[in-house]
Structures are given as C-alpha cells and as structure tokens.
Amino acid sequence: MRRLSGILVIYIISTVLFGHFTNVARARYHYHKGRHGVTHPLPPPPPPPLETANPPDQVPSDPYPSPDPAPGDSDSGCVFDVTSFGAVGDGSCDDTAAFQDAWKAACAVESGVVLAPEGGVFKITSTIFSGPCKPGLVFQLDGVLMPPDGPEEWPEKDNKNQWLVFYRLDGFTFSGKGTVEGNGQKWWDLPCKPHRGPDGSSSSGPCASPTMIRFFMSNNIEVKGLRIQNSPQFHMKFDGCQGVLINEIQISSPKLSPNTDGIHLGNTRSVGIYNSVVSNGDDCISIGTGCSDVDIQGVTCGPSHGISIGSLGVHNSQACVSNITVRNTVIRDSDNGLRVKTWQGGTGSVSNLLFENIQMENVLNCIIVDQYYCQSKDCRNETSAVKVFDVEYRNIKGTYDVRSPPIHFACSDTVACTNITMSEVELLPEEGELVDDPFCWNAYGKQETLTIPPIDCLLDGSPVVEEAYDSNYGC
C-alpha cells in the first residue's frame, strides 16, 4: 500500500512539472506578428512628432485604368520598375514615357512603388506626376534622375518654370539612395541671371529657369535619403501642402549658383526638416507667406545664404508666418545666418520664432531682421509693414565675418519689432579682435543674459502705437 501511494505521488509531481515546463517553452517561443504592409520610418531624433494634418478629401478608388502587365515585372505586384516599361537608363534616351506609365500603374494600386533602379541614369523631360492615387504610393529612386542638359535641349513645348511636379497626392513618399541631378550649369550661365562682380555687386534680370522638384497641393509627404544637386533654380519647393517630413537628404550646388534655394516653403503647414545637409548659392531654407508650424533640427547649412523667413509683403501684400523653430543647427561660410526680411508697404505678421542651439562659423549677418528689403535702388519709403514680434534667440554661438555687424535689427519706422529675447548669444569675429557693435532701429526686447557683443540698443517695453497696429494688421 505504501509502495502504491509513493508511485501515485511521483506520478502527480511529474505531471505538474511537465505541464509547467511545457508552458514555459511555449511562452518563450510566443511572438506577435506585425501587421502586413505597415511601414515604420525611422523617427528623426530628437524632434517631436509632427502635428496631425487635417484629413484631405476622399481619394477616388480607381483614378487610373489598370494597364496591361509589362514584361519583366518584379515578383511583387506592387513594384513597378521603370525598365520594365521601356526605360533605357543610359543618360541619353528620353525615358519620360516609361516613368509616366510606371506612375500610372503604381498609382492605381495600394502601396504601389515606382522603382528607378540602381545603375540607371534616367533622363526625363518636364513631367507632372499627379494624383489622387491609392494609399501608400512610393517613388523609389536608387539610380540617377536628370532633366535635359540646359535650355537648348529643353523641349520647346515644355514648361521652363518647373521640372518634376508632384500634384494632389496624399500619403506619398519620395525616397531612395539615388541622386536627382539638375544639370544646372548652362542655366546659371544665362546672361539674364544675376552675376556677382568682383566688387561684390550683382546685376539681375529675371528669366525662366526650372525649379527642380515641386510638391503642389499635397498632404502627408515624406522625402528621405536622396541626394539632390545642381538645380537650375530652387532645388525643392512646397506650395499649398500640409504635413511634410524631410529627413536625411543632401542638397548641393556651387556657392555662386544663382537662385538655387535648397528648400522653399510657401503656404505650407506642419513641416519637419531634420538631419540634412544643404550647401548652395542662395537660401538653405526659405520660408514664405502662409507657413506655420515648421520645425527644423539637425541641419548643416552652408556655404549658402542661411535660413530665411521671407521676403514678405512685396507689392503691398499681406504676409502671415508663425510658429517657426530652428534648433541644433550649424550655419557656416554663409552670407546670412538667421534672417527675417520684409518689404516696406506690406501688412500681416511674423510671430513666435525660436532659434536655439545654433553654431555659426564665419557667417556674415549672423542675426538679422531687415524690414527695408529691396532688390533695387529706387524702392520708396512706405508707412505700413509686416509686424515682427515674439522672437527668441537662445544659445547662438560662434564666429562672424567682420564685413558686417553680427546682429542687425532694422525694424520699420512705424511698425516696431517687439518682444525680442536674447539669451546666451556669443558671437566673435572670425578674424581680428575688434568686436562690432550690434545695430538696432525701433526694436524692442530684452537680454536675459549678457551677450557678446553687448546689445544695449534694444528698447525697453512696447511702443505706444501697438494697439492700433494689432487692430489693422493681425493675421
């Protein structure tokens, strides 16, 4: 009886232990499968997430008829290699039709990918890639994409003001490890382009030259990983967009290439520009009217004309810009650093600007507000102006080009700049020991800490006419 009881106890203990180890083993090998088709782009450290854009109009279910499958398509039904649609990729043949056909095919399916593969040099003429498209569309550029070489090769029927246009898209990504080559040299050499003389002066005459990449009336756009270079004019432009993320791109053109702004924003909201390098012949980043909630971090800028807000208020127009942040950025060998420029006679406002943790290296006009911006010698004096207020400069350090004072606040005679805050600003001459005095005109603000050079020219308090301005010019 005792032997039987012992056997029964051993059996019960063995059963319990076996069940326990089985559950442990199952727990070790249990996993959660990710959702199919969901991508997780690397978050740009350290910026906060962008604000959620307002939902756009509903996208039609099938904007393009499905084309017949092209021979040699990828095993994935969602990847449309342009070479399968007839692209040659030798840098000489016109591959425009192949890109248009691949776009139509990818646009018609969810998570479609237009692929320009590595090793190809694809030449296409001025093209509008339009939507609406199915969700998740990607243009993957791993080769080289370029326009015709100069104005003489540009087709007569094509628009000379733009080359690649992305229009009416939502949830679109332009990415890859490839290069967008602008072939800009012959455009820069046109006699109507501004050219800088040996004395530093320039003569200008407007003439049509294409912006290389333009996003127009689109939402939730991402551009990442690309190299964009030698644009005839602006490298990348966003007009009427909302929800833009630009991450880990390189933009480059020669220092004296005219009008080659790196990234230009106009009437665009909720923008993040992160971890990128821009060197060019004009503004690194320019922010025009109608822009708000722009976050710029981790950018290396220069040689260039710096980071600019404006020009604003031209031809007596109203301009509204607000909530712009520039942090953790380097500006080097540039004609300007952090600039706000407005024309006389405009209305509206520029407000809530934060410039923080900026390193300057041999920069002319490190900090500048210019409310007398003019591109000729005959601009007349006017009483109205775009109001500039609530501007913070924090931890701005480095060296400046001694040809101009490092701090310059030239505010309107009638519409003062107000609530300017300076904290931990230390700017020393790149050459020599003489520190230039800042310039202030009708600028109100405060120093939270001592600055180098000392900025004793800021006025205390607020101007008497402030209330009258707010009732007439507010955005």
From Swiss-Prot:
Tissue-specific expression: Expressed in flowers and stems.
Primary location: secreted
Transmembrane regions: none
Gene Ontology cellular component list: extracellular region
Sequence segments annotated as region (Disordered): 35-75
Span of the signal peptide: 1-27
Keywords for the protein's UniProt record, in alphabetical order: Cell wall, Cell wall biogenesis/degradation, Glycosidase, Hydrolase, Repeat, Secreted, Signal
PbH1 repeat residue numbers: 241-267, 268-289, 291-311, 321-342, 350-371
Composition bias type Pro residues, residue spans: 41-50
Keyword Transmembrane helix (UniProt): no
UniProt subcellular location: Secreted, Cell wall
Family designation: Belongs to the glycosyl hydrolase 28 family.
Family annotation (PANTHER family): PTHR31375
Task performed by this protein: Polygalacturonase not involved in the final stages of pod shatter.
Name of this protein: Polygalacturonase At1g48100
Taxon lineage: Eukaryota, Viridiplantae, Streptophyta, Embryophyta, Tracheophyta
